[in-house]
Swiss-Prot record:
Originating organism: Saguinus oedipus (Cotton-top tamarin)
Keywords of this entry: Disulfide bond, Secreted, Signal
Signal peptide residue numbers: 1-20
Protein's name according to its UniProt entry: Beta-microseminoprotein J1
Gene from which the chain derives: MSPJ
Single GO cellular component term: extracellular region
Compartments where found: Secreted
């Protein structure tokens, strides 16, 4: 029974890690025109097949017809929202969960989702 439970926990962890939040931005294409770059939402240009990280911690890739981006940030769920708060760190793309009254103490988080 413990082996089965352990296997389910490992499986659930991989499903959570692989279920990233992603979106696509279509490139403005003119029929007959070939382009070798993408323009992101901020107006920055990126060469085809290049990758970059946005200020909001999304990992993006420029492709011929679109830009595809996926979040790098796991979001905590299943914690005491009355006692604890989320703090987002853009430098390392992580959210920490700490006590509202004493931010030096971390809170227990039951699950993380992408």
């Amino acid at each position: 029974m413990n082996v089965l439970l352990g296997g389910l926990v490992i499986f659930a962890t991989f499903v959570t890690l692989c279920n990233a939040s992603c979106y696509i931005i279509l490139n403005d294409m003119i029929p007959g025109d070939s382009t070798n770059e993408c323009t992101d939402l901020k107006g920055n240009k990126h060469p085809i097949n290049s990758k970059w990280r946005t200020d909001n911690c999304d990992s993006c890739t420029c492709r011929e017809k679109e830009i595809s981006c996926c979040t790098l940030v796991s979001t905590p769920v299943g914690y005491d929202t009355h006692k604890c708060q989320k703090i987002f760190n853009k430098e390392d793309c992580r959210i920490s969960v700490v006590e509202k009254n004493d931010p030096s103490k971390t809170c227990e988080v039951n699950a993380w989702i992408m």
